[in-house]
Amino acid sequence: MASDHQTQAGKPQPLNPKIIIFEQENFQGHSHELSGPCPNLKETGMEKAGSVLVQAGPWVGYEQANCKGEQFVFEKGEYPRWDSWTSSRRTDSLSSLRPIKVDSQEHKIILYENPNFTGKKMEIVDDDVPSFHAHGYQEKVSSVRVQSGTWVGYQYPGYRGLQYLLEKGDYKDNSDFGAPHPQVQSVRRIRDMQWHQRGAFHPSS
């Protein structure tokens, strides 16, 4: 018989999402645990988010309440201070969160130069791409079609800059995925059960 957390194939089942927000850095001070969407962290009594511990994820956090503003992807791991979950270093504000649904082992994404899925395109299947330029794609990214899997796009190569969560579906222009400009230069898959010791995704050098 399979155990509680094992499927018949022996693969671990996804755990219920769980994230703990601390008011101070290094997991100090008042804390609040979430297992579902939180449109406004302040309504839980938290003045600010100084550090984050993801026990089961992944999650996406937002700079503003009601899932607006800059996005931050959190995978299972420790985030001892705000600059461990953002490399854009534009804001230390974290005001709302929700779990990310990861329901596909397959990953396929198509990025288009122009809005409405026109112009030059780049198709990526089951791979992480730290630099579009290295793959010969030097165009802007104005629209995106995610056919399977869940992805995160980054403003700059090497998984740096602003982050854009790309879930299954069509994004007709860059504002649909939260980008102020049609600039995405690296992309990676979000896979459940990943563990990042240092929190934010750090590619191996």
From Swiss-Prot:
Residues 193-205 are annotated as: C-terminal arm. Keywords: Acetylation, Eye lens protein, Repeat. One of its GO terms (biological process) is lens development in camera-type eye. InterPro entries: Beta/Gamma-Crystallin, Beta/gamma_crystallin, G_crystallin-like. Residues 2-16 are annotated as: N-terminal arm. Pfam families: Crystall. The keyword DNA-binding does not apply. Residues 102-106 are annotated as: Connecting peptide. Residues 17-56, 57-101, 107-148, 149-191 form the Beta/gamma crystallin 'Greek key' domain. The modification N-acetylalanine is found at A2. GO terms for molecular function: identical protein binding; structural constituent of eye lens. The keyword Repeat applies. Crystallins are the dominant structural components of the vertebrate eye lens. Has a two-domain beta-structure, folded into four very similar Greek key motifs. PANTHER family: BETA-CRYSTALLIN B2, BETA/GAMMA CRYSTALLIN. Homo/heterodimer, or complexes of higher-order. The structure of beta-crystallin oligomers seems to be stabilized through interactions between the N-terminal arms. Belongs to the beta/gamma-crystallin family. This is Beta-crystallin B2. It comes from Rattus norvegicus. The gene is Crybb2.
